[in-house]
UniProtKB/Swiss-Prot annotation:
BP GO terms, sorted: thiamine biosynthetic process; thiamine diphosphate biosynthetic process; thiazole biosynthetic process
GO MF: nucleotide binding; sulfur carrier activity
Chain positions with Glycyl adenylate modification: G66
Entry superkingdom: Bacteria
Protein's name according to its UniProt entry: Sulfur carrier protein ThiS
Modifications after synthesis and translation: C-terminal thiocarboxylation occurs in 2 steps, it is first acyl-adenylated (-COAMP) by ThiF, then thiocarboxylated (-COSH) by ThiI.
Keywords linked to the UniProt accession: Nucleotide-binding, Phosphoprotein, Thiamine biosynthesis
Primary gene name: thiS
Taxonomic lineage: Bacteria, Bacillati, Bacillota, Bacilli, Bacillales
GO cellular-component term (any): adenylyltransferase complex
Pathway: Cofactor biosynthesis; thiamine diphosphate biosynthesis
Chain's role: Is the sulfur donor in the synthesis of the thiazole phosphate moiety of thiamine phosphate.
The keyword DNA repair belongs to this UniProt entry's keyword annotation: no
Organism field: Bacillus subtilis (strain 168)
C-alpha cells in the first residue's frame, strides 16, 4: 500500500520504481516533480528508487493554460 497524493493506493507489484509508478499513470513523458517520504527525487533517479510499502508519494505535474 502506498499513499499517493494523499490517498491510499494499492501498488500491484511486489517491487517497482518511481519510473514504474509514473508509467502506470501514463506520466513518464510529462514534466513532474516526485516527492517520496518528504524527499524530492531527481528525474535521473526515477529508474533506481524502489518503492516500499507505506511510502508516501506526492506527484505534481504542470498543466498549461492561459
Amino acid at each position: 500500500m502506498l499513499q499517493l497524493n494523499g490517498k491510499d493506493v494499492k501498488w500491484k507489484k511486489d517491487t517497482g520504481t518511481i519510473q514504474d509508478l509514473l508509467a502506470s499513470y501514463q506520466l513518464e513523458n510529462k514534466i513532474v516533480i516526485v516527492e517520496r517520504n518528504k524527499e524530492i527525487i531527481g528525474k535521473e533517479r526515477y529508474h533506481e528508487v524502489e518503492l516500499c510499502d507505506r511510502d508516501v508519494i506526492e506527484i505534481v505535474h504542470f498543466v498549461g493554460g492561459g
